[in-house]
């Protein structure tokens, strides 16, 4: 359960917290000028039988946000959780265990389209309100030769990435087209997350008087 807002210290009443260690998610938020703290979640990433990929991504996003929000020592009001998965033929592709696993994943994606699904959750610690959803992007890979696959693996980029590639890196050279959100493939559906933060009163991205973060005073 979420911490009782009435028992939260006063200095917990403002601020955004990203419950993720992903540098890519941090870069996306920072790139639009949002101020936030990073507190990686320790929530277990376990699968549930008969769960759809979308349900899986949303559930894990909520778990991550809730786990960090429930830590009494963590300061902040709005908590962002996210989980990104790559799905090919209804099979979820995680992060490659080793070079052979990466080669198998890339070979299975070669010359085909697949889906990248990012779940996201934004939790307001004070009101207890939670907003969560998932965004799907279709990614098309060009046909890759075995030499290209091995060369890409040698760069080290596939490791630590769901599906064994990074669209924001060298992997972009393998992807002629996508249908949907680019930032979703990077790891965070930025448009939807920022819109949710605005609805919950955490940011004012397009306010003429900015500041970006609602809890900060406007410039004199």
From Swiss-Prot:
It catalyses: dTTP + H2O = dTMP + diphosphate + H(+); UTP + H2O = UMP + diphosphate + H(+). It is found in: Cytoplasm. Its EC number is 3.6.1.9. GO terms for biological process: nucleotide metabolic process. GO terms for molecular function: dTTP diphosphatase activity; UTP diphosphatase activity. It comes from the Bacteria. InterPro entries: ITPase-like_fam, Maf-like. The record marks 24, 84, 168 as: Important for substrate specificity. It is an enzyme of class 3 (hydrolase). Its main location: cytoplasm. GO terms for cellular component: cytoplasm. Its cofactor is a divalent metal cation. Keywords: Cytoplasm, Hydrolase, Nucleotide metabolism. The active site is at 83 (proton acceptor). Pfam families: Maf (PF02545). Belongs to the Maf family. YhdE subfamily. Nucleoside triphosphate pyrophosphatase that hydrolyzes dTTP and UTP. May have a dual role in cell division arrest and in preventing the incorporation of modified nucleotides into cellular nucleic acids. This is dTTP/UTP pyrophosphatase.
């Amino acid at each position: 359960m979420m911490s009782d807002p009435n028992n939260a210290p006063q200095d917990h009443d403002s601020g955004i917290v990203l419950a993720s260690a992903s540098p890519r998610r941090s870069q996306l938020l920072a790139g639009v000028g949002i101020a936030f703290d990073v507190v990686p979640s320790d929530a277990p990433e376990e699968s549930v039988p008969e769960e759809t990929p979308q349900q899986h991504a949303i559930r894990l996003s909520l778990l991550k946000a809730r786990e960090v929000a429930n830590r009494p020592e963590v300061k902040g009001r709005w908590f962002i959780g996210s989980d990104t998965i790559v799905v090919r033929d209804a099979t979820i592709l995680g992060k490659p265990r080793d070079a052979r696993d990466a080669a198998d994943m890339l070979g299975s994606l070669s010359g085909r389209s697949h889906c990248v699904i990012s779940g996201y959750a934004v939790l307001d610690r004070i009101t207890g309100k939670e907003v969560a959803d998932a965004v799907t992007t279709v990614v098309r890979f060009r046909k890759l030769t075995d030499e290209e696959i091995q060369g890409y693996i040698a760069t080290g980029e596939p490791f630590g990435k769901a599906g064994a590639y990074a669209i924001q890196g060298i992997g972009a050279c393998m992807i002629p087209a996508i249908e949907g959100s680019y930032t979703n493939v990077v790891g965070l559906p930025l448009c939807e997350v920022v819109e949710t933060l605005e609805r919950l009163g955490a940011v004012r991205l397009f306010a003429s008087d900015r500041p970006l973060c609602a809890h900060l005073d406007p410039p004199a």
